[in-house]
Structure formats: structure tokens, C-alpha cells
Swiss-Prot record:
Organism encoding this protein: Saccharomyces cerevisiae (strain ATCC 204508 / S288c) (Baker's yeast)
Domain of life: Eukaryota
Database matches in Pfam families: DUF468
Note: Contained within a telomeric X element core sequence.
InterPro entries: DUF468
Family designation: Belongs to the UPF0320 family.
Name of the protein in its database record: Putative UPF0320 protein YAL068W-A
Length: 84
């Protein structure tokens, strides 16, 4: 059985222009080590870089080593939900 290497809920604001801050909830769930590397390189590092280099934006990042039992069974889940 493969455990989830990276699982987290990212309410991250993305800026489409200087005055708009639409909010998207991104839930990323990866299973297996190869997905872990992909997730880190593709999502986590850019998100952290975006968070650290963008002023006046609050964000909550929760990264767990083990996925909760109630987490989805699917792999490579990337859902965008507009919460504006």
C-alpha cells in the first residue's frame, strides 16, 4: 500500500492584476514517492515562493506527512474552487 507523501489544503490568493485578489482553495493529494517529488517541485515551492514574496496576503498552509483516513483515495487530485 502506498501512503500519501503530501496532502494539504491551500487557501491561496492568486493575483490576476494589481487590484484583484480572487481566492481559490487548492487541495492537493498525492500518493507515492514519485508524486511527492512532483508535488514539491510543481506546487509547494512555487506556492511558498509566492506567499513569501507577495505582501498584504494572508495564507494558511497545512502540510501533513500522513493523510487522514477521511482523505480521498484518488491520486493526483487538484481541485480549484472559486470562493469569491
Amino acid at each position: 500500500m502506498h501512503g500519501t507523501c503530501l496532502s494539504g489544503l491551500y487557501p491561496v490568493p492568486f493575483t490576476h492584476n494589481a487590484h484583484h485578489y480572487p481566492h481559490f482553495d487548492i487541495y492537493i493529494s498525492f500518493g507515492g514517492p514519485k508524486y511527492c517529488i512532483t508535488a514539491l517541485n510543481t506546487y509547494v515551492i512555487p506556492l511558498l515562493h509566492h506567499i513569501l514574496t507577495t505582501p498584504f496576503i494572508y495564507t494558511y498552509v497545512n502540510i501533513t506527512e500522513k493523510s487522514p483516513q477521511k482523505s480521498p483515495k484518488h491520486k493526483n487530485i487538484l481541485l480549484f474552487n472559486n470562493n469569491t
